């Protein structure tokens, strides 16, 4: 099972969080984008733009932060953080 945790932070306080699960037989990349889309839907946000810094941070740590410069519209928080908390087993694919 693939699980991603989405969190909204402001002034070092957690305002909202949600966990998205995905059991589909799909690539990791597709699961990440689908989970991010669901997190943004739950939080009523537009989808953030993946900057080179967010991509490289996510590739290294399976975790990244989308700050104000990643969103087209104004956001009332400091950043949206996403983190993969459970990966599919390689042998299950």
Segments predicted by a language model, with ranges:
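Short, flexible N-terminal segments of the mature chain
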Residues: 14-42
């Amino acid at each position: 099972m693939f699980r991603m945790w989405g969190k909204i932070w402001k002034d070092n306080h957690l305002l909202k969080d949600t966990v998205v699960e995905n059991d589909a037989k799909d690539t990791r990349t597709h699961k990440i984008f689908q989970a991010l889309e669901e997190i943004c839907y739950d939080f009523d946000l537009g989808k953030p733009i993946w900057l080179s810094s967010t991509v490289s941070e996510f590739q290294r740590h399976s975790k990244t932060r989308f700050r104000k410069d990643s969103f087209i519209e104004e956001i009332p928080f400091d950043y949206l953080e996403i983190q993969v908390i459970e990966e599919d087993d390689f042998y299950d694919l």
